[in-house]
Amino acid sequence: MDDDSSKALGLSDEAALAPLGNVIPPQLAAEIEAARSYRARSKAANTVRAYDSDWRQFEEWCWVRDLEPMPAMPEAVATYLASLAQAGRADSTIGRHLAAIAWHHRQAGQVAPQHRDPRDVIADTLAGIRREQRARPTRKKSAILAADLARMIAAAEGQSPRAIRDRAVMALGLAAALRRSELVALQLADLELVREGLKLTIRHSKTDQEGAGQVIAVPSGKVLKPGPRLNEWLSVRGGEAGPLFYRTDAQGMMTKEPMSDRSVARLIQRYAEKVGLDPAVVGAHSLRSGFLTEAAKAGASLPKMQEVSRQKKVEVLLGYVRDAALFENHAGERFL
């Protein structure tokens, strides 16, 4: 268990379980430490980091307004959520901030604010935010289709470490329908090269917070060629354990640090602009949605699409299928 997790999860277990003599026997001490370790694993590391960041933001917001963050009054929490909505934060982000506040209260032995809110000010505020955001038009990032991505890959010219890496990132991002968080979390050990292409182990994802892990197949490919492009990157990267994709410095040289999810988004937008696409309407998620759109157009079955995308809700995949078939056998096709 790392130091951050120990601090976040280190409740006064000894004080609660100490015998009358206030001396913890060695066996009980070991069992207490085991319980702490299991609690530390109850949340994915990325979730704990996000909760810690959200909690620090809430603390700062409270201090500026001379409010007490712990234990927080329900009215203070509701007002904080409203301030996030006013700042343009997404409903999912606001919900995560609330979960972070509740989690930190529980770790400190306090009752979460929403569980001592007889007037339901938190629940009602959150419901109002969600109702307003549903009514507000949202513009999703456009899918990048295979033909456009092939042009983007071609625009990553040269044999510099950055160019070779960028080609591999783009090809693999679409071929494996990866979220940007999954792309940057990949380790070299998660990759297995096989005759047909490669097997990729996704250890944690948005829909796999317990870290059960999922293995997906990525064919070598004939258009985007994710297999050969990844092999080219590996010949530059080397076989040292660590992140699959390293960050490059200002001179384009390779470091040993992992890429950030934001750098992946910027990479996609940079090459999109190079081939004439609007960078404002594309992002890292455009690769994932591009795979699903292309798979739907090609007539792939929902189970096969789900194998790669790992989405639990079939309704999301059905949306891609409907979008891909909008103009097929159109009712007005023979007379318009």
Segments predicted by a language model, with ranges:
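Extended, non-catalytic subsegments within catalytic or DNA/protein-binding/adaptor domains
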Residues: 1-336
